[in-house]
UniProtKB/Swiss-Prot annotation:
SMART domains: Arg_tRNA_synt_N (SM01016), DALR_1 (SM00836). It is an enzyme of class 6 (ligase). It catalyses: tRNA(Arg) + L-arginine + ATP = L-arginyl-tRNA(Arg) + AMP + diphosphate. InterPro entries: aa-tRNA-synth_I_CS, Arg-tRNA-ligase, Arg-tRNA-synth_N, Arg-tRNA-synth_N_sf, ArgRS_core, DALR_anticod-bd, Rossmann-like_a/b/a_fold, tRNAsynth_Ia_anticodon-bd. This is Arginine--tRNA ligase. Signal peptide: none annotated. Its EC number is 6.1.1.19. Keywords: Aminoacyl-tRNA synthetase, ATP-binding, Cytoplasm, Ligase, Nucleotide-binding, Protein biosynthesis. The keyword Protein biosynthesis applies. The gene is argS. Monomer. It comes from Methylococcus capsulatus (strain ATCC 33009 / NCIMB 11132 / Bath). The keyword Nuclease does not apply.
């Protein structure tokens, strides 16, 4: 209905342009919102106030001109001018009821649109280092990124979901060294484990698998490993210096081939686990993009040459720097260290050049909130590469804190392992985890109440919404038990019988659903859809508790059944976009 009114307004404004009441080149701002007070109609437009200055006309007088130029439409009973120049639209109840027919005919497609016009959008999300299992912090980014991608797709965008695999660099070398040291323990070697190594049980598991499948292929004596190493932190040394020395020793003792085998054993095991974990969470990707491939294909070197040719690279203290301050960053960034090694940022520059070259109309990065300071340097790099930095949208996700009732849950074990996404999912289920993760704006702090998420009460929002869907299904089971059948066509012809306050409220809410999906997609804001579904469920539960559906009056019964079936369909559609199931029984 909102789109229909926009079309009417646009026609009226074109008529005023033709009549000379508006400049011919006047941009047409269309802002139509639902009214909060029914006394002010169903929709209101502030178009006259926005155009008054350029039209050199009093807003109320211009509103009258617009109103007079509006084409007739059977859905609009009347229009009124209110306040400083609002145009209020009063709609025919029967016309509003047609949303029930639309929902029935469109089914799962109701709420989808073509506003994105097929624009290609890449959504990169999670992209956690493959150095350990995903934890609950990654879970929020996974749920948020997946829903944003699904919403954009529902709005007509061509969405490409991508995970950037950080399979190169120092952290991966530390993982490989950690796996190797645990492997040596399996071989019977006794040696201290680095203070800065990866200590999780998953490292022991990878090492045990390596020993079981490869025997002692990678064995070296503990004496050879420890020879010449600096002191670790417990001995008064520097843990960073120590772990770097261990990595270097691992590479030297194993040699390139065997080191790469150990490296890949750790990477492949953890990456397989991440893929499985996200798949079970309902999160899927079109592409898993390897950071290592950027170096192996020469993409990093090519990106650096492009920055140099644009005049944004200089040398200082033996290193190569990106002059990002010239493009708004707070300080310049190192691209190549004095030892000749490229930085993580250099790989990121190459990765974003790759994104630009793939021709996406929009690039959406979902990052942890701690990466906020990283945004200016990446935008600066895109600009220096000759790209359009405005194509990049960075969406920040705050960490989630777990509670059980009022008691805060310990987020990590003694060895520093975080509560994993899999542990959370096993406790509360995929549906609750997905729903709770997107209930609030992504950049807002989030308290995740495990006790609430597993409760079967109206206070649990996901249960409350799913229960509304199940309740509708139960009504249709009761219909079958009575030996009755719904006459869908008769119900559609008798929609005027839906005149109770609860019914009119539900009809108005159902007609809002496409607008909510569009808003949630364009604003990257899944919480709008969550709030809508909670409100719709509340309205339905109120209707369920106050009205009988299976009445003797066949016309009224079928009209009401069509209404609640429309509610069921919209709830199912909305939950589907959130990656949450719509159960028929609970």
């Amino acid at each position: 209905m909102k789109k229909r009114l926009e079309t009417l307004l646009r026609s009226a404004l074109e008529r005023l342009k033709t009549a000379g009441d508006l400049p011919a080149d006047q941009e047409v701002p269309l802002q139509i919102e639902r009214t909060r007070d029914p006394a002010h109609g169903d929709f209101a437009a502030n178009t006259a106030m926005l155009l008054a200055k350029s039209a050199r006309c009093d807003p109320r007088r211009l509103a009258e001109k617009i109103r007079a130029a509006l084409p007739e439409d059977p859905a609009v009973i009347r229009t009124e001018i209110a306040g400083p120049g609002f145009i209020n639209f009063f709609l025919d109840a029967i016309a509003q009821h047609r949303v029930i027919t639309d929902i029935h005919s469109q089914g799962p497609g109701f709420g989808r649109s073509s506003i994105g016009a097929g624009q290609r959008v890449q959504v990169e999300f999670v992209s956690a280092n493959p150095t350990g299992p995903l934890h609950v912090g990654h879970g929020r980014g996974a749920a948020y990124g997946a829903v944003v991608a699904d919403l954009l797709e529902a709005a007509g965008f061509d969405v490409h979901r991508e995970y950037y695999v950080n399979d190169a660099g120092r952290q991966m070398d530390i993982l490989a060294a950690s796996v190797w040291l645990r492997y040596l323990e399996n071989c019977g070697e006794v040696l201290p484990f680095p203070a800065n190594g990866y200590r999780g049980e998953y490292v022991r598991d990878i090492a045990s698998d390596l020993y079981r499948t490869q025997g002692e292929r990678y064995r070296t004596s503990a004496d050879q490993v420890l020879l010449g190493l600096p002191p670790d932190e417990p001995q008064g040394g520097d843990k960073e210096e120590y772990i770097d020395a261990v990595v270097s020793k691992s590479k030297n003792l194993l040699g390139p081939e065997r080191y790469r085998e150990v490296f890949n054993a750790g990477l492949d095991s953890i990456l397989d686990d991440i893929r499985d974990d996200l798949g079970e969470f309902g999160t899927h990707y079109q592409e898993w993009f390897s950071e290592r491939s950027l170096t192996e294909t020469g993409a990093v070197e090519r990106a650096l040459e492009r920055l140099k040719s644009s005049g944004y690279v200089y040398e200082k203290d033996g290193a190569q720097w990106f002059a990002s301050t010239r493009l708004g960053d707070e300080k310049d960034r190192v691209l190549v260290r004095e030892n000749g090694q490229t930085t993580y940022f250099a790989s990121d520059v190459a990765y974003h050049l790759n994104k630009l070259e793939r021709g996406f109309d929009r690039i959406v990065n979902v990052w942890g909130a701690d990466h906020h300071g990283y945004i200016p340097r990446v935008k600066a790099a895109i600009q220096a590469l000759g790209g359009d930095a405005s194509k990049l949208e960075v969406l920040l996700v705050q960490f989630a804190v777990l509670y059980r009732g009022t008691e805060r849950v310990q987020m990590s074990t003694r060895s520093g392992e975080f509560v994993t996404l899999r542990q959370l999912r096993n406790e509360v289920g995929k549906d609750a985890a997905r729903f709770f993760y997107v209930m609030r704006k992504s950049d807002q702090h989030m308290d995740f109440d495990l006790k609430l998420a597993t409760s079967r009460t109206n206070e649990n929002p996901v249960y409350y919404v799913q229960y509304a869907h199940a309740r509708v299904c139960s009504v249709f089971r009761q219909l079958d038990e009575k030996g009755w059948a719904r006459d869908l066509g008769r119900g559609m012809r008798r929609l005027e019988r839906l005149c109770e306050p609860h019914e009119l409220t539900l009809v108005a809410s159902l007609s809002r659903y496409p607008e909510v999906v569009e808003q949630a997609a364009l604003q990257y804001a899944p919480h709008h859809l969550v709030h809508y579904l909670r409100d719709l469920a509340a309205e339905f539960h109120g209707y369920y508790n106050s009205c009988q559906f299976l009445v003797e009056d066949g016309d009224l019964r079928d009209a009401r059944l069509n209404l609640i079936d429309a509610v069921r369909q919209v709830i199912a559609n909305g939950l589907g976009l959130l990656g949450v199931s719509a159960p028929e029984t609970m």
